[in-house]
Amino acid sequence: MKRGDALKILEELKNSPNMIKHELAVGFTMAALYDYFKDKNPPPPDGGFGGPEMTKEDWEITGIMHDADYEITGKSLELHTEETTKKLKEIGASQQIIDAVRGHCDKAPRNSLMAKAVYACDELTGLIVACALVQPEKKLSSVTVESVQKKFKDHSFAKGANRDQIKTCEDQLNISLEEFIALTLKTMQTHASELGL
């Protein structure tokens, strides 16, 4: 499965422009996390990167696919990922990608680093977008790590962003919250034009 296949599935499942931007943000962040782990910790022999054959593109595809059917299933958590799973199976996606996509909404165990990563960065990208939208310019370039940290502590801000889920970066990914925010923000700023921010 290639990145282009993932983007085609988003079209087939009638994703809105804003949802596509969210999925791309998570995809870009997943690719950055792959590089982070490759640099910091070579993959363990048991395939902790999602499987011994998982590539950077696979990590990005997992990020792009994680919410592919969220709108078409009426935002129902019970139905979420079911349509995506069908599409991924039809196209011959790896079981590791399918499990990671399903795992982000508790429909499969998050046993791999890839599954744990998409679970943590899903909510953080949303929080960072919310931080950008309250800036006068509504641009990611105006957002700082410090401003995200401040908003993270303010539970009345972006209430839908699950802080506990974001904080799994610490015990599941062994990345401090500050470093996780910094990596995600930098990645999103690098791709700001593609994210419309």
Language-model-detected regions and their locations in the chain:
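Divalent metal-dependent catalytic cores for phosphoryl transfer on phosphate-bearing substrates
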Residues: 55-158
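Hydrophobic alpha-helix position signal
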Residues: 10, 34-37, 84, 88, ...
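C-terminal binding/interaction regions
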Residues: 14, 139-140, 145-195
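Electropositive phosphate-/nucleotide-binding environments in soluble metabolic enzymes
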Residues: 4, 20-24, 78, 142, ...
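Amphipathic alpha-helix face/heptad-repeat signature
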Residues: 22, 117-120, 184
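Acidic/His-rich, divalent-metal-binding segments that scaffold phosphate/diphosphate chemistry
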Residues: 1-42, 50-76
